[in-house]
């Protein structure tokens, strides 16, 4: 069956978004040498489960608070959800959905990045209730 192999973040201010995600998750960004502003994103070591992605200049207006999510929301596995939510807020992000328990799975929260994009963060915890 087909699998997701790549994700893409659209940004009004790409440099600001690169800094946000680099500081928050330690992701590596490499400017693509092609004709458009595009950054390749490496989210972890080769051989570790997960996918890599890209970041591109947004074409058109950014999302507003009144719009529902249009597109897919990526959720990032983190070791300490509370710490990462604090890092996201300190880095210029905002809280979209507060921390909640997913029983027997873990803890989940949703944030918005500096560009208004929503992303999830989850801490595995089989005792979450």
Language-model features: where?
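Core segments of cupin and vicinal oxygen chelate
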Residues: 2, 8-50, 90
